[in-house]
């Protein structure tokens, strides 16, 4: 059994200001050190992460006193820098491994003995440091009529930079040929809004107080790569920079082949297709469908829109709660479990998947050489 020691140290401070429960401010800071980064060599082990927030409880102002239905209303804003060291330990060090493949081709003689050759698998980068996220947030919240109606609204922007990235490249064969190294390179941003609407109340039920509440929340967020180490020879439509972090790489369907003549005059992938098969777009116009015609399209597999409903009630020592969540505005590649269908109890997505007993509705409406229109 191997025991590995690790160590991290952090210093935290928080300063709060409250004037008449009307003007609020808070300042926090963290000074953190992590063993995962080089210390004595580059001084990248330690980093400072400050944040600040302010709020104005506008409902306390005299000019709001006539609005008796308003329980509380607050306007707020915040900015902060967050650090992340969730990376592999010692990624800043060089690593080596034995050359595999043909042993005779990767052997050398040292002091009269045949030795297996070593090569550098990762080149050291002692400047590796923390991943940083700069967050901006502005919003407001209020409650009315003793809690009968409440609302929270926030708009946010997150800018993440210095993301640890495996960088590829080449160097002279005398050093081993191909290599990769880690660097703080990638940049991603995310922006969106969050809304929560709530209701709570108390009633008298059978001589005992009955309380209940409900809240609905909705979040919309969209991300993209601001910088990604795309290879110089990567075609424009396959680059990650400027696109969603989880965007899929796919061929673009132009419809279905309607006739043998259309197949003869079109580009296609692999073996000759049949009438009724999918027709893909030849993005680079070279007269064939290959990997260079795959492009990054659509959204990622994480919902851009999430929503939820929370319900709760309590009476006479009993309480009950329920939670419902959902997501929308995301894309899923129909492969793996989604392709097989039966792994997750969904309807089959392929009419003739590996001899599966597919639903009649899919068989009846599937394209065929006799009827490529997908409808009979």
Features from the language model and the residues they span:
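Outer-membrane beta-barrel transmembrane domain signature of Gram-negative proteins
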Residues: 4-26, 38, 111-112, 123
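Hydrophobic, lipid-facing positions within transmembrane beta-strands of outer-membrane proteins
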Residues: 9-15, 31, 48-56, 73-75, ...
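Extracytoplasmic gating/loop element in the C-terminal half of outer-membrane beta-barrel translocons
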Residues: 34, 271-277, 327-366, 370, ...
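Flexible, surface-exposed loop regions and adjacent strand-edge segments
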Residues: 42-51, 91-99, 168-177, 229-239, ...
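Conserved small-residue
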Residues: 91, 98, 183, 202-301, ...
